[in-house]
Amino acid sequence: MFDSIRETIDYAVENNMSFADIMVKEEMELSGKSRDEVRAQMKQNLDVMRDAVIKGTTGDGVESVTGYTGHDVAKLRDYNETHHALSGYEMIDAVKGAIATNEVNAAMGIICATPTAGSSGTIPGALFKLEKTHDLTEEQMIDFLFTSALFGRVVANNASVAGATGGCQAEVGSASAMAAAAAVAIFGGSPEASGHAMALAISNLLGLVCDPVAGLVEIPCVMRNAIGSGNALISADLALAGIESRIPVDEVIEAMDKVGRNLPASLRETGLGGLAGTPTGEAIKRKIFGTAEDMVKNN
């Protein structure tokens, strides 16, 4: 287990190993399972992600129990078929996958936490877009997920991937960074470039607060995953182009941790501040749960 991204990169270079193979090796040692068994387990995760994207993008999609999120993928699909999307057709594919996954999550469907349920659309959005546009094989997609896991584990051990601890930067920000690093690795970038991709992705979302309306993983969480997927692909392209983060990746992770812990509790998943604390956010909360007095009476 590595204490930093720097150690991870150095190990990959010194041992001429891919990040995916490093993660597989560590999982084999930890679980006692064979390489085939470990990869088969990751394939199950990939299958869950694919099923969620398919469910969320089929027909009119899905709707959350509250009715406040859902069906937006269908709107985006129809728009993309009849308009020249400003962000490009391919980017819309990533956005659709991200939104679809989080709409399925909000509708109580089955998703794969990457690294959390609240950020579960960011990695699939980027990954399935790359599968479509760059003909990724299933083995490459599994490698993508192992690479994401390796980078994500370092973030989790040195900072946090929980919105309640570090804000949305720790959830969607971490997921976006994991996807960016993995994309660079899968497309032949150097280990150093993967580190820069992660640093750039986190830097771009540094300070993002966690302010779920009514405390539910719907508003603004679903759409933030769309931004996370787009940010991952942009950060990967920057790194593959040779652009570097001036702040080393481990220092960026440390900064994210400090920023997150300095956020007031109202901006760390409590549903009290930010968008959740707006008049409309409060009204939505009352409509779903009633007033505080109602809640006391019901208990």
Segments predicted by a language model, with ranges:
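Generic N-terminal targeting/processing segments that precede catalytic cores or assembly contacts
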Residues: 1-109, 133, 242, 249-299
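Conserved phosphate/anionic-ligand binding catalytic regions in large, soluble enzymes, centered on
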Residues: 108-126, 170-175
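Alpha-helical support elements that line or immediately flank enzyme active sites
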Residues: 124-135, 180-188
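A structural signal for small-residue-enriched, beta-sheet-centric alpha/beta enzyme cores
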Residues: 163-176, 180-186, 191-299
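Glycine- and small hydrophobic-enriched segments that form the cores of compact globular domains
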Residues: 86, 113-120, 132, 136-137, ...
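Short acidic, glycine/Ser/Thr-rich loop/turn "cap" segments at secondary-structure junctions
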Residues: 106-114, 127-130, 160-165
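Conserved active-site and cofactor/substrate-binding residues in soluble primary-metabolism enzymes
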Residues: 33-48, 89-96, 106, 121, ...
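Acidic-glycine-rich active-site phosphate/pyrophosphate-binding loop
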Residues: 88-105, 140-159, 204-212, 247-250, ...
